[in-house]
From Swiss-Prot:
Similarity annotation: Belongs to the universal ribosomal protein uL16 family.
Transmembrane intervals: none
Entry-linked Gene3D superfamilies: Ribosomal protein L10e/L16
Name assigned to this protein: Large ribosomal subunit protein uL16
Organism (species): Thermoplasma volcanium (strain ATCC 51530 / DSM 4299 / JCM 9571 / NBRC 15438 / GSS1)
């Protein structure tokens, strides 16, 4: 079965559906690593990727954004010169009522009778002004981190902004 477009699950409607003990066969989230880079070093510059609208972010979108930032920063700065943390966890279970299509589908399917749906994936509920990612680095790689976070924002279903939360005077002096 083909994956449905993410725009079907973007809006937040109704309460969160998270009680996995009552469901059978919830697929695991694709994102498994939430903290990357050098966790021990104290970096002078910190930037945050902040959601500007409320939405649900699928686990595949979170993973794509994480991979994007990680790849760009490891190529530019190496593993020891940055820190990355993905903040939201995809708790909300997404359901889909599979519909039969093609010739003779009306004889096989029961239409919208018992249309509750089966679990097909997970999503994180992100509200307006929530932090999605936190990135830290030094002065030499601050510009790369800002570009990496902007590229990650493209992969998410909400408009985002990059905010410098630590080291504004350093970042301003180097032109970030």
């Amino acid at each position: 079965m083909v994956t449905k477009p993410a725009r079907m699950y973007t809006r937040i409607t109704g309460p969160a559906y998270t009680r996995k003990e009552f469901m059978g066969g919830v697929p695991y989230p694709k994102i498994t690593t939430f903290v990357q880079g050098n966790q021990k070093r104290d970096f002078p510059i910190e930037m945050q990727l902040i959601a500007m609208e409320s939405c649900q972010v699928r686990h595949t979108a979170l993973e794509a954004a994480r991979v994007s930032v990680n790849r760009r920063m490891t190529e530019a700065a190496g593993l020891d010169n940055f820190y990355l943390k993905v903040v939201p966890y995809p708790h909300h279970v997404l359901r889909e009522h599979k519909m039969a299509t093609g010739a003779g589908a009306d004889r096989i399917s029961s239409g919208m009778r018992a249309a509750f749906g089966r679990p097909v994936g997970t999503a994180a509920r992100v509200y307006q002004n929530d932090v999605i990612m936190i990135g830290r680095t030094d002065e030499a790689h601050a510009h790369e981190l800002k570009i990496a976070l902007k590229k990650a924002a493209i992969k998410l279903p909400t408009p985002c902004k990059v905010v410098i939360t630590k080291g504004k005077e350093i970042a301003g002096a180097i032109g970030v």
